[in-house]
Amino acid sequence: MQARAVRRHIRSSPLKMRRVINLVRDRSVPEAVAILDYMPQKVTGVVEKTIRSAVYNLMDQHDERFDEGALKLKEIRADEGPTFQRHQARARGRAAPIRKRTTHLKVVVAVEEEAPEEAAA
């Protein structure tokens, strides 16, 4: 069982977002949230909210409560969104471009399957 949450048009560059999500990729949900709590980056709050949203989506879709320790981040991805372009006045009547980048964040949470124990022969 799995569920996803998507957050779009986040006002942060994808590179800054990827620096954070690379540290929590392929971890359990409580471990990822604990790591995010102690990181100083501004985007950690957005990443944590999106992870929690995916967990709640899983509980809502399957009408049952899951132990958060059994949930794992199956996929977490930061894609580039639209770029807002502005101009800043420069010397001699010129203009320099300002690119305000945005990010689309996708989180997929799945129930970690336990390996079946082999029967002793």
From Swiss-Prot:
| PROSITE patterns cross-referenced by the UniProt entry | RIBOSOMAL_L22
Q: Which UniProt keywords apply?
A: Ribonucleoprotein, Ribosomal protein, RNA-binding, rRNA-binding
Work out whether the entry's keyword set contains Cell membrane.
no
- MF-aspect GO terms: rRNA binding; structural constituent of ribosome
| GO-annotated cellular components | cytosolic large ribosomal subunit
Which GO BP terms, alphabetically? Answer: translation
Pfam families assigned to the protein according to its UniProt record, in alphabetical order: Ribosomal_L22
Q: Which family does it belong to?
A: Belongs to the universal ribosomal protein uL22 family.
Quaternary arrangement and interactors, per the entry?
Part of the 50S ribosomal subunit.
Q: What does this protein do?
A: This protein binds specifically to 23S rRNA; its binding is stimulated by other ribosomal proteins, e.g. L4, L17, and L20. It is important during the early stages of 50S assembly. It makes multiple contacts with different domains of the 23S rRNA in the assembled 50S subunit and ribosome.
What name appears for this protein in its UniProt entry?
Large ribosomal subunit protein uL22
Native species? Salinibacter ruber (strain DSM 13855 / M31)
Which gene produces this protein?
rplV
